């Protein structure tokens, strides 16, 4: 056989977009979305291979910032779920909304204390935040 380490590696961009750190009192939520329409972006049917991720900062139940970033791992090989989970953790995400995650990405986020909230695919991001009780 080819051995364990000969499979495709996930795509790793050397130029990940910088994003400001979370300030105290702010909850940062992330959600995979299909199109970059800010708070109106629909939740994607897939997690790790969604074309975009929306990062939402919420303070006191009010949305204070929304940014939709392209998912640089969407076209990667195997192991994309782990790469996306690590990327979200590096952004300071504490809540993930969206469809079911793969077992490895889910385990990594749970170990890091990230709350995972199921969200119906196609639901606008703002509505999903309200349903989850975040905003």
Task: Cite the ranges covered by each PLM segment.
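Short secondary-structure boundary segments
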Residues: 33, 99-100, 121
